[in-house]
């Protein structure tokens, strides 16, 4: 029985949309524009330890579409998940929280953003898959490796 208690454990407790905002500062006139919009996408990942083995992971997506110099829409969504992570070596928690958890959450974020854009009256925008491992490694390089694993799963 004690062997079972020491087994690595990873569980999704909840996935939820934490926040979403949509702005259309130039509607309805923007709907008359014939030019294709330019689209910028930004993604960020944050993690917070809620309890000894429980983490909230937050994947934020910001999509800005512009026609010429006018903003067609700006949408920001924060997709969150609560994950229970137990009996995982400390040096493996940060990559799990920074790579695996965001990879699980991103399809929900992508769906919520696409739905909001369509409901706002714009053509659908499908966000491409994101390589969260590359994003994680880039973040580590920017931090210069400073206490990345020592943060014990909390990335900022």
Curated annotation (Swiss-Prot):
InterPro entries: SecB (IPR003708), SecB-like_sf (IPR035958). It is found in: Cytoplasm. Keywords: Chaperone, Cytoplasm, Protein transport, Translocation, Transport. Its main location: cytoplasm. GO terms for biological process: protein folding; protein tetramerization; protein transport. GO terms for molecular function: unfolded protein binding. Pfam families: SecB. One of its GO terms (cellular component) is cytoplasm. Belongs to the SecB family. One of the proteins required for the normal export of preproteins out of the cell cytoplasm. It is a molecular chaperone that binds to a subset of precursor proteins, maintaining them in a translocation-competent state. It also specifically binds to its receptor SecA. HAMAP family: SecB. Homotetramer, a dimer of dimers. One homotetramer interacts with 1 SecA dimer. This is Protein-export protein SecB. It comes from Paraburkholderia phytofirmans (strain DSM 17436 / LMG 22146 / PsJN). The gene is secB.
């Amino acid at each position: 029985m004690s062997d079972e208690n020491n087994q690595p454990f990873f569980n999704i407790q909840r996935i939820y949309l934490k926040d979403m905002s949509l702005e259309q500062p130039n509607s309805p006139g923007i709907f008359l524009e014939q030019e294709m919009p330019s689209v910028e996408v930004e993604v960020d990942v944050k993690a917070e330890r809620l309890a000894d083995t429980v983490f909230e992971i937050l994947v934020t997506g910001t999509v800005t579409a512009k026609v010429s110099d006018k903003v067609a829409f700006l949408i920001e969504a924060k997709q969150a998940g609560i994950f229970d992570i137990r009996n995982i070596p400390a040096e493996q928690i940060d990559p799990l929280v920074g790579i695996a958890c965001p990879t699980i959450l991103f399809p929900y974020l992508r769906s919520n953003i696409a739905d909001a854009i369509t409901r706002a009256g714009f053509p659908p925008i499908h966000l491409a898959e994101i390589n969260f491992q590359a994003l994680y490694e880039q973040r580590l390089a920017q931090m210069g490796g400073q206490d990345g694993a020592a943060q014990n799963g909390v990335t900022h």
